[in-house]
């Protein structure tokens, strides 16, 4: 192994290099670099050394809760009303239905042909699997009117689309839309309890 020699540099600060505490020049005082340097004042902790105020998140504000409530109550926010009953909920733009059990090779044109008879389709979302490039197995269809979406659900739920039966229901709902159909969908083959998970291997 090679010996690496390092040369130590001795640094002696000059009088002009040192900070003076009260703005006066240092005349004949101890000029060693370890002499009492003035303490820097923190903008966070304050000049008198008080502890820093803890804040959370970006763009924090120093305001009381009442000020915040007053500021927020003066603004108009777009919101959707709800009657509180269980059933379908409208999205911001329209009524969206979820079609599940869609064949992996289904095209947007196939969905439009099957569901376009019930009303104008405002938006159609057919997600693809990145790895395979095939449809993930579901589609989201948006209608302008609730009646159009309801007629599509009634007519197409259980219907065949490209050799597969599809299930059609509301994409957004508050609680079960129908008691019996909700129980039937969420119970697996008539079992009332969930199966146990296998033991963990160590």
From Swiss-Prot:
Expressed in root and shoot meristems, cotyledons, vascular tissues of leaves, receptacle of flowers and siliques, and pollen grains. It comes from Arabidopsis thaliana (Mouse-ear cress). GO terms for molecular function: mRNA binding. The gene is Y14. Residues 1-92, 173-202 are annotated as: Disordered. Keywords: Cytoplasm, mRNA processing, mRNA splicing, mRNA transport, Nonsense-mediated mRNA decay, Nucleus, Phosphoprotein, RNA-binding, Translation regulation, Transport. This is RNA-binding protein Y14. The keyword RNA-binding applies. InterPro entries: Nucleotide-bd_a/b_plait_sf (IPR012677), RBD_domain_sf (IPR035979), RNA-bd_8 (IPR008111), RRM_dom (IPR000504), RRM_RBM8 (IPR033744). GO terms for biological process: mRNA processing; mRNA transport; nuclear-transcribed mRNA catabolic process, nonsense-mediated decay; positive regulation of gene expression; regulation of translation; RNA splicing. It is found in: Nucleus, Nucleolus; Nucleus speckle; Cytoplasm. Residues 95-173 form the RRM domain. Residues 7-24 have a biased composition (Acidic residues). Its main location: nucleus. Residues 59-78 have a biased composition (Basic and acidic residues).
């Amino acid at each position: 192994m090679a010996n690496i020699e390092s040369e130590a540099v001795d640094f002696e600060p000059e009088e002009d290099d040192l900070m003076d505490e009260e703005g006066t020049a240092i005349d004949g005082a101890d000029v060693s670099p370890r002499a009492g340097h003035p303490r820097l004042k923190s903008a966070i902790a304050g000049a008198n050394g008080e502890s820093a105020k803890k804040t959370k998140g970006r763009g924090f504000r120093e305001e009381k809760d009442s000020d915040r409530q007053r500021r927020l109550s003066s603004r108009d926010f777009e919101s959707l009303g709800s009657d509180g009953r269980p059933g379908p909920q409208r999205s911001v733009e329209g009524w969206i239905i979820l079609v599940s059990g869609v064949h992996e090779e289904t095209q947007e044109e196939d969905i439009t042909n099957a569901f376009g008879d019930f009303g104008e389709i405002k938006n159609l979302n057919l997600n693809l699997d990145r790895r395979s490039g095939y449809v993930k197995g579901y589609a989201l269809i948006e209608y302008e009117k609730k009646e159009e979406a309801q007629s599509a659900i009634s007519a197409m739920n259980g219907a065949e689309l490209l050799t597969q039966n599809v299930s059609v229901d509301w994409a957004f709902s508050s609680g079960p839309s129908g008691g019996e159909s909700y129980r039937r969908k969420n119970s697996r083959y008539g079992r009332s309890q969930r199966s146990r998970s296998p033991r963990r291997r160590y």
